Amino acid sequence: MGSKFFVILGSQLFNPKILKKNGCSEVYMAEDFGLCTYFKHHKLKLYLFLTGMREYRDELENESISVNYFELSSRKKGESYVDSLIKFLKKKNLSEINIFEIEDKAFEEEFLKALKAANVTVNIFQSPMFIFERNEFVSMAKGKKVYRMSSFYQKARKNLDILMDENGKPVGGKWSFDEDNRKKIPKNVEPPEMIVFKKSKYAEEIKKLIINNFDDHPGDLENTWFPVNRAGAEKQLDNFLKVRFENFGIYEDAMLEEKNFLFHSCISPFLNIGLLTPDKVIKKTLQYAEKNNVPMNSVEGFVRQIIGWREFIRGIYHEEGALQSKSNYWKHSKKLTSSWYDGTTGIDPLDDCIKTTLKDGYIHHIPRLMVISNIMNLCGVDPKEIYKWFMEMYIDSSDWVMVPNVFGMATYADGGMMSTKPYTCGSNYILKMSNYKKGDWCDTLDGLYWKFTEKNRKFYENNPRLALLTRSLDRLNPERKNHIFKKAEDFIKQNTI
């Protein structure tokens, strides 16, 4: 057993075995008003973090790791996390601490600067939250002016020898089975129910604390659908493998009205706070897939989410996040009205996705990308405003997740640093991938889509992959064009500032 003193953040709830392996015998943990309020985080996100931290305290103590834990009730509202930590270290006469890599760049900078000024030595350990080290991403992306997930993913598969045959070729003959993952869910296919987790002994206390301190944050606390400890997170993964994994691939991009989780694993919240780690998730997934003959499009699609997208996004964030977060390629400047926070915009699928988000603090990637952020972008909303909304509304949100996803993928605000084209769509795509009914909303969304295309005609004409769009725009019936453009203008007036 080592004797190292670790500072553990609320997003670093790693297996105690990892701490012990790194020589940890004692930790500092603190709930913090500043970290709870730097965005108006969804109430369920606060619940996940605060309950998860207290459950983790118990887990560490059961593993004979000494825990110095400060609950919110013992903290002064105006005092920062770092100031409080430095006071504690002085009191304990500690001049050296250990910590896992901090993913949030601004907080990392504040933390290291303050501790240096206080003459505290900080030893930084590689984060188990990711498979690759930060500098590995740099070497894999060396010399590139633009970044592409597909080339990163291929290198990752080769480096890790995952889904590779004996000749060094991808199993199944291709790197991605994404084309097989675009079916809508038929009426006779019922997605399985989510498992119900045992309520945490801290549940009621934390709910009261949130209502008393953060009642103006979005969302409600009714549907605590997720686990808040390691055993529960592992159970969630096991349940996905047993009842959802087989159909995950084929229906990965599908949407259903008033249904949320479908065939998705829903483990991103637990990966993003350390209750699960990607190395173990991949190992368990591949073992299960081999034993149970899971279809290749499901296996590859899930592996791509974990070792492709997730690692790629983190790498982009540390290399280019500072630049991305200042970018605004389309020069959008509009702000969101309250309708985006209560689901009353008047576009049916959008309102359904917002209401689901308020209820669950979660929705899978297609509604996030092709419904919510797509429509925000088509309306000319400032990417910083879109980023803020996503940070506030999801329990799996983090700066490292949302900066590349919003400024890169969702809005193309970075001008194509990590994607070849903006992800925009009209009503056709949404109808094709879902059971949403046709309605008045279709004209509004189509108007937004074609209006955006017309406004950015030069961009589309200069891109060989997209030039076809302007030709389709020019073929629009003038009467229909006027009608849908008017609907779009009315929508923008009513739902943006």
Each language-model region and where it sits:
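N-terminal beta-strand-loop-alpha-helix module at the start
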Residues: 1-72
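C-terminal catalytic domain of photolyase/cryptochrome flavoproteins
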Residues: 9, 13, 235, 254, ...
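Short helix/loop capping segments that flank catalytic or ligand/cofactor-binding pockets
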Residues: 15-18, 37-39, 249, 279-281, ...
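A short acidic (Asp/Glu
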Residues: 16-19, 39-41, 79-82, 107-112, ...
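Well-ordered alpha-helical segments embedded in enzymatic catalytic cores
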Residues: 52-55, 80-84, 349, 353
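Acidic-and-aromatic substrate-binding clefts and catalytic sites of carbohydrate-active enzymes
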Residues: 73-79
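Beta-rich, aromatic/charged-enriched effector core domains that present basic-aromatic interfaces
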Residues: 80-226, 407
